């Protein structure tokens, strides 16, 4: 028995139209799949942690406990932790044996070496090319062109949280170069 075209129970699509739809749909799916990573690349990542901050972590990736940290570090010390963006960041122990309100990114502004704290000279000295920074991270001797980047350090619930420093650099009185 022959069916009439245009009846409501039979779709009005031939083989050629179906194959065109299938080909176009597949090509569109592949194109969108390839476009997704490109679009994601241009969208900035969301800040991790609480309120845009990151909890300081030790070398093993564990959260640093302030009470344990202060028991192990003397006043006026600087100790490395994992900070913003996973960069090594110094936690500052103040003269009154409390955590400072800022942390210092330990990456040298000359060539990106990690700058160790020299406690005997009370400054940071880069092992790569000899750049020196005072105890606040301000550059005092080149070839490094800029001071170490700052991060806010706040203590809550026995944890240290680093957040981005966006206001004026207290060491130079200028806008921060790292924002």
Swiss-Prot record:
It is an enzyme of class 7 (translocase). It is found in: Cellular thylakoid membrane. Residues 61-162 form the Rieske domain. Gene3D superfamilies: Rieske [2Fe-2S] iron-sulphur domain, Single helix bin. Its cofactor is [2Fe-2S] cluster. GO terms for biological process: photosynthesis. The Rieske iron-sulfur protein is a high potential 2Fe-2S protein. Signal peptide: none annotated. Binds 1 [2Fe-2S] cluster per subunit. GO terms for molecular function: 2 iron, 2 sulfur cluster binding; electron transporter, transferring electrons within cytochrome b6/f complex of photosystem II activity; metal ion binding; monooxygenase activity; oxidoreductase activity, acting on paired donors, with incorporation or reduction of molecular oxygen; plastoquinol--plastocyanin reductase activity. InterPro entries: Cyt_b6_f_Rieske, Rieske_2Fe-2S, Rieske_2Fe-2S_sf, Rieske_Fe-S_prot, Rieske_Fe-S_prot_C. The 4 large subunits of the cytochrome b6-f complex are cytochrome b6, subunit IV (17 kDa polypeptide, PetD), cytochrome f and the Rieske protein, while the 4 small subunits are PetG, PetL, PetM and PetN. The complex functions as a dimer. It comes from the Bacteria. The lineage of its organism: Bacteria, Bacillati, Cyanobacteriota, Cyanophyceae, Gomontiellales. It catalyses: 2 oxidized [plastocyanin] + a plastoquinol + 2 H(+)(in) = 2 reduced [plastocyanin] + a plastoquinone + 4 H(+)(out). This is Cytochrome b6-f complex iron-sulfur subunit. Its EC number is 7.1.1.6. The chain crosses the membrane at residues 21-43. Keywords: 2Fe-2S, Disulfide bond, Electron transport, Iron, Iron-sulfur, Membrane, Metal-binding, Thylakoid, Translocase, Transmembrane, Transmembrane helix, Transport. It comes from Cyanothece sp. (strain PCC 7425 / ATCC 29141). Disulfide bonds join 113-128. [2Fe-2S] cluster binds at residues 108, 110, 126, 129. It is a single-pass membrane protein.
